[in-house]
């Protein structure tokens, strides 16, 4: 298992990529970069980027490439990411994939892509049952019975874009934009697909088996 490598975790909204990315980051001792969390932090702080991004996210649309890449690249350039990191929520478009590939090649870094496969029906069920900590961005399932975050004790909330109409838009948008990304990484020999409808622990073990090959 390599540590000095970048792992890109892909999958539709609600596929568990945030949870799996965090688990992998803890296992390998690498930073976890979530473009979604970075954008939400910018929105919460009302930065110029955050204000622009919120208009797209609230409508279930993808944030334009330039806005997302600016904040992701800034984070990747930090010293703690020099030995590798776990990236989730990025790239979502072919343009973003090329930008990230060129950045990593220039940095003489290797990377692998893990695609989490989940059916639409399961995605909708998962998203309807999830709650978010607005402070530390951890995701919890309704079945866990938490009303506040066990870590920071903030009240758990639903995301404003976790409605059926917006979820369906996001799924359709994801499929339309990421098909070319998946093909791009497959052609480069970087892609591994992992079935992700089992329990989080079982999915994580499947991911570990893939990266240990």
Curated annotation (Swiss-Prot):
<feature type="binding site">
    <location>
        <begin position="61"/>
        <end position="63"/>
    </location>
    <ligand>
        <name>AMP</name>
    </ligand>
</feature>
<feature type="binding site">
    <location>
        <begin position="139"/>
        <end position="140"/>
    </location>
    <ligand>
        <name>ATP</name>
    </ligand>
</feature>
<dbReference type="Pfam" id="PF00406">
    <property type="entry name" value="ADK"/>
</dbReference>
<comment type="function">
    <text>Catalyzes the reversible transfer of the terminal phosphate group between ATP and AMP. Plays an important role in cellular energy homeostasis and in adenine nucleotide metabolism.</text>
</comment>
<feature type="binding site">
    <location>
        <position position="149"/>
    </location>
    <ligand>
        <name>Zn(2+)</name>
    </ligand>
</feature>
<comment type="similarity">
    <text>Belongs to the adenylate kinase family.</text>
</comment>
<dbReference type="InterPro" id="IPR033690">
    <property type="entry name" value="Adenylat_kinase_CS"/>
</dbReference>
<comment type="subunit">
    <text>Monomer.</text>
</comment>
<dbReference type="InterPro" id="IPR000850">
    <property type="entry name" value="Adenylat/UMP-CMP_kin"/>
</dbReference>
<keyword id="KW-0545">Nucleotide biosynthesis</keyword>
<dbReference type="GO" id="GO:0004017">
    <property type="term" value="F:adenylate kinase activity"/>
</dbReference>
<dbReference type="GO" id="GO:0005737">
    <property type="term" value="C:cytoplasm"/>
</dbReference>
<keyword id="KW-0862">Zinc</keyword>
<dbReference type="GO" id="GO:0008270">
    <property type="term" value="F:zinc ion binding"/>
</dbReference>
<feature type="binding site">
    <location>
        <position position="96"/>
    </location>
    <ligand>
        <name>AMP</name>
    </ligand>
</feature>
<feature type="region of interest" description="LID">
    <location>
        <begin position="129"/>
        <end position="162"/>
    </location>
</feature>
<feature type="binding site">
    <location>
        <position position="170"/>
    </location>
    <ligand>
        <name>AMP</name>
    </ligand>
</feature>
<feature type="binding site">
    <location>
        <position position="35"/>
    </location>
    <ligand>
        <name>AMP</name>
    </ligand>
</feature>
<protein>
    <recommendedName>
        <fullName>Adenylate kinase</fullName>
        <ecNumber>2.7.4.3</ecNumber>
    </recommendedName>
</protein>
<dbReference type="GO" id="GO:0005524">
    <property type="term" value="F:ATP binding"/>
</dbReference>
<dbReference type="InterPro" id="IPR027417">
    <property type="entry name" value="P-loop_NTPase"/>
</dbReference>
<keyword id="KW-0808">Transferase</keyword>
<keyword id="KW-0963">Cytoplasm</keyword>
<feature type="binding site">
    <location>
        <position position="40"/>
    </location>
    <ligand>
        <name>AMP</name>
    </ligand>
</feature>
<keyword id="KW-0479">Metal-binding</keyword>
<feature type="binding site">
    <location>
        <begin position="14"/>
        <end position="19"/>
    </location>
    <ligand>
        <name>ATP</name>
    </ligand>
</feature>
<feature type="binding site">
    <location>
        <position position="159"/>
    </location>
    <ligand>
        <name>AMP</name>
    </ligand>
</feature>
<feature type="region of interest" description="NMP">
    <location>
        <begin position="34"/>
        <end position="63"/>
    </location>
</feature>
<dbReference type="InterPro" id="IPR006259">
    <property type="entry name" value="Adenyl_kin_sub"/>
</dbReference>
<keyword id="KW-0067">ATP-binding</keyword>
<dbReference type="GO" id="GO:0044209">
    <property type="term" value="P:AMP salvage"/>
</dbReference>
<feature type="binding site">
    <location>
        <position position="198"/>
    </location>
    <ligand>
        <name>ATP</name>
    </ligand>
</feature>
<feature type="binding site">
    <location>
        <position position="136"/>
    </location>
    <ligand>
        <name>Zn(2+)</name>
    </ligand>
</feature>
<feature type="binding site">
    <location>
        <begin position="89"/>
        <end position="92"/>
    </location>
    <ligand>
        <name>AMP</name>
    </ligand>
</feature>
<feature type="binding site">
    <location>
        <position position="133"/>
    </location>
    <ligand>
        <name>Zn(2+)</name>
    </ligand>
</feature>
<comment type="pathway">
    <text>Purine metabolism; AMP biosynthesis via salvage pathway; AMP from ADP: step 1/1.</text>
</comment>
<feature type="binding site">
    <location>
        <position position="152"/>
    </location>
    <ligand>
        <name>Zn(2+)</name>
    </ligand>
</feature>
<feature type="binding site">
    <location>
        <position position="130"/>
    </location>
    <ligand>
        <name>ATP</name>
    </ligand>
</feature>
<keyword id="KW-0547">Nucleotide-binding</keyword>
<keyword id="KW-0418">Kinase</keyword>
